[in-house]
């Protein structure tokens, strides 16, 4: 049944959740050498997300159709990405039509942030995650949506001059101050290295794109708040990433996650490109050469048609037998 649902979602990708997720992510266009109290356009360009035109609620908030048992759902991460795309369009054009849409997405995220243990602001998912990622219950939170909501709400706050948004941002940031065992999204390995988990379970997954998007949210919060703990979290995560980045290199493609004792899952063509754009942004922010090194290497993989074909074949086999 799982394979059947995946086939249906792919076959109907123009009307499924893939209609949103597979909209191209491009290299960011902002200025990333910023000082305190400054934010520019987001670190990757989500403006293509604004082209999503399939399902919206009556207020204009995007809905995703996962087909099968999950059906049509709100996804906090998708809403934050759509909002960041709207912000990119506003930065580029200054057209007023984007302001109302930015407001709608921001208000949804604020209205749907619930307060949990330790005062943590939670953007909860109302549907189950994939069994592969060990998320079998509704009501879970994810570092990627928590982080991207922070990034979007801070930009919306500045664009709309809605300084009250900072209250929700501060609650969301608390999820990065607590471990998964205390209601947060942070996990640690045996060496004490920090991970911001897209799928917060006991076993460390270190999904690469989710980890980095979460780091961007922490970094944005640091820029606006000057919070020393946010700076430390970002630096600790950079140390983790620099140490483990070589493990994401399959020799012909990038790896999606670092689950141990599992067959290595290659990133899809879409997410391989996301990894490249994220690493370019991290290099622009930090000037750490390792990020540029892997961005260049993985871009060469991307431009090699044989490597691309091998990655596609490997991914299809993985999805059928292991996902």
Residue spans of the language-model regions?
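Glycan-recognition and catalytic cores of secretory/periplasmic carbohydrate-active enzymes
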Residues: 1-323
């Amino acid at each position: 049944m799982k394979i059947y649902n995946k086939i249906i979602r792919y076959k109907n990708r123009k009307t499924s959740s893939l209609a949103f997720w597979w909209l191209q992510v491009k290299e960011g266009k902002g200025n990333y050498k910023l000082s305190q109290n400054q934010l520019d356009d987001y670190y990757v360009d989500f403006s293509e997300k604004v082209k999503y035109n399939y399902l919206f609620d009556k207020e204009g908030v995007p809905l995703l159709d996962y087909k099968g048992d999950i059906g049509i759902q709100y996804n906090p991460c998708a809403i934050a990405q759509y909002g960041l795309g709207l912000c990119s369009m506003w930065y580029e054009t200054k057209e007023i039509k984007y302001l109302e849409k930015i407001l709608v997405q921001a208000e949804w995220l604020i209205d749907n942030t619930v307060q949990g243990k330790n005062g943590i602001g939670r953007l909860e998912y109302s549907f189950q995650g994939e069994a592969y990622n060990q998320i079998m219950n509704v009501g879970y939170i994810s570092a990627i949506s928590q982080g991207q909501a922070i990034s979007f709400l801070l930009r919306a706050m500045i664009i709309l001059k809605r300084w009250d948004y900072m209250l929700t941002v501060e609650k969301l940031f608390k999820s990065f101050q607590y471990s998964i065992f205390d209601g947060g999204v942070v996990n640690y390995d045996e060496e004490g290295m920090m991970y911001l988990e897209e799928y917060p379970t006991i076993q460390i997954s270190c999904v690469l794109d989710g980890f980095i998007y979460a780091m961007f949210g922490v970094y944005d919060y640091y820029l606006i708040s000057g919070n020393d703990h946010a700076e430390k979290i970002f630096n600790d995560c950079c140390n983790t990433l620099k140490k483990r980045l070589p493990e994401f290199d399959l020799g012909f493609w990038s790896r999606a996650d670092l689950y141990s004792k599992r067959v290595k899952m290659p990133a899809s063509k879409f997410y391989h490109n996301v990894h490249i754009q994220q690493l370019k942004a991290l290099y622009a922010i930090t000037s750490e050469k390792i990020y540029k090194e892997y961005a260049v290497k993985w871009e060469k993989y991307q431009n090699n048609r044989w490597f691309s074909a091998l990655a596609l074949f490997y991914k299809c086999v993985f999805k059928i037998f292991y996902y």
